[in-house]
């Protein structure tokens, strides 16, 4: 199925590109999410007229994401307290929700879906580098310090 992308979609294409995808992916995900429209003659003509507005909208979204990335960089690191055993192993684990909440408590709104844990959840005390993917093009690393609660 031929579609026109209304947004940058990772592993698929950028705004305005006509791409061929499976019908189910287009019908069930891209079109309902507002990321694409079917590539009919009418939609192609309409898109060419609205292209400037969509590019400006994406530029605004990206600039807002860059501003959030700068705030997170200024933050540098966050500290999370958790119950731990003698050898530094946590009772439980620290996941994406805990990290997102800690960043939000520091004054920067962050969703748990933006937090990337390359090695899985945090199960030990100490310093851990965590990636925050704010936008498809913008990713920021932050230091998470896990301290044992007394």
Curated annotation (Swiss-Prot):
Family annotation (HAMAP family): Ribosomal_bL9 (MF_00503)
Key words, A-Z: Ribonucleoprotein, Ribosomal protein, RNA-binding, rRNA-binding
Annotated function: Binds to the 23S rRNA.
A cellular-component GO term for this protein: ribonucleoprotein complex
Gene Ontology molecular function: rRNA binding; structural constituent of ribosome
InterPro entries the UniProt entry points to: Ribosomal_bL9, Ribosomal_bL9/RNase_H1_N, Ribosomal_bL9_bac/chp, Ribosomal_bL9_C, Ribosomal_bL9_C_sf, Ribosomal_bL9_N, Ribosomal_bL9_N_sf
Pfam families the record matches: Ribosomal_L9_C, Ribosomal_L9_N
Entry keyword annotation includes Signal: no
Official protein name in the record: Large ribosomal subunit protein bL9
GO biological process, one term: translation
Primary gene name: rplI
Record's keyword annotation contains GTP-binding: no
Family label: Belongs to the bacterial ribosomal protein bL9 family.
